[in-house]
Amino acid sequence: MAGAEGAAGRQSELEPVVSLVDVLEEDEELENEACAVLGGSDSEKCSYSQGSVKRQALYACSTCTPEGEEPAGICLACSYECHGSHKLFELYTKRNFRCDCGNSKFKNLECKLLPDKAKVNSGNKYNDNFFGLYCICKRPYPDPEDEIPDEMIQCVVCEDWFHGRHLGAIPPESGDFQEMVCQACMKRCSFLWAYAAQLAVTKISTEDDGLVRNIDGIGDQEVIKPENGEHQDSTLKEDVPEQGKDDVREVKVEQNSEPCAGSSSESDLQTVFKNESLNAESKSGCKLQELKAKQLIKKDTATYWPLNWRSKLCTCQDCMKMYGDLDVLFLTDEYDTVLAYENKGKIAQATDRSDPLMDTLSSMNRVQQVELICEYNDLKTELKDYLKRFADEGTVVKREDIQQFFEEFQSKKRRRVDGMQYYCS
């Protein structure tokens, strides 16, 4: 036994050992990822006829539109049919895009699936991703010169991809947030800072009454005073952090409202603050104006948002106009999210996905079905017994062992057929 353990140890040092469970789990994970990205897109029909598709899997062809040419994007079906042998950049998914394949941007290629297309799609938006460059560092992915392992995260607004270390704030664990808005988009859509104080995952804590907020992050900060600040006295106090802790900024808003008994108590101060907030909301009917009534901190960082945060955005007439002016109306569309797209793909795949074994059985007559089931049971039993020997001895199963098993199994099968043995063993 000791000798067997020693041999197994030497084998494990020479060869990477991967369990069958690991292989199956990795295969299932890759299949699920592919289904999530591609399942919501048609792999056989060009999407051009659908107009600007709300969200679809996209590719850019470096062979047809290299850097220096006009950027162009192609749908999933065209990536297979028209660009199968070309060098492609996988763009994951993008919103409101119409397939460019074969239009005027492609000098020597006509779309095989739908050749009759307009010269250009004026509604499409392009960025450096279409030339295989990502993030503010404008590097390819994967980057052969980058030795730092880092997750790439897509901004929900501009849809560019960013290295986590280039976002100005350390990303939370991937399961702790659903979407990210990059630094540039937070500057352009500055109204989001009002929501970030309440919703963003980068916010560390909000104490009982919402008057004291501790926000942790990296980057410059700008204190935004309340818009109805005539009756408020706002002060910014910076605490000296304890050694080994991150910098923490403490913002405290003091109310100088009409005096009341025990006005120095926290509960009375909370009541006054909430009443003023409710009055502001009832007058304007705008969630954003209510949030802007509180003191905020704007920082030069990206922000990370939880599941369903978009449903908290105000949809009053003024805010909807603002979203339109900023070209971010999609933020109010629950079906715009990548998660919604992925769920749509998973449902479609689950509906279409068939069991190969059951498909094969259904095409056979009764005798053939019985024979196939018997063969399957024989294979299952013998393979289990064969692998059990390796487990008992503590040795690693190699490629040659599996090849040997199937050779022996086929040999036994031939002997059974030659002997006219028409029953299950």
Swiss-Prot record:
Alphabetical list of Pfam families matching this protein: zf-UBR
Zinc fingers classed as UBR-type: ranges: 44-116
SUPFAM superfamilies: FYVE/PHD zinc finger
Tissue-level expression: Expressed in sperm (at protein level).
InterPro entries: UBR7 (IPR040204), UBR7-like_UBR-box (IPR047506), Znf_FYVE_PHD (IPR011011), Znf_RING/FYVE/PHD (IPR013083), Znf_UBR (IPR003126)
GO MF annotation, one: zinc ion binding
GO BP, one annotated term: protein ubiquitination
The protein's Enzyme Commission number: 2.3.2.27
Keyword terms of this UniProt record: Disease variant, Intellectual disability, Isopeptide bond, Metal-binding, Phosphoprotein, Transferase, Ubl conjugation, Ubl conjugation pathway, Zinc, Zinc-finger
PANTHER family per UniProt: E3 UBIQUITIN-PROTEIN LIGASE UBR7, E3 UBIQUITIN-PROTEIN LIGASE UBR7-RELATED
Full protein name: Putative E3 ubiquitin-protein ligase UBR7
Gene from which the chain derives: UBR7
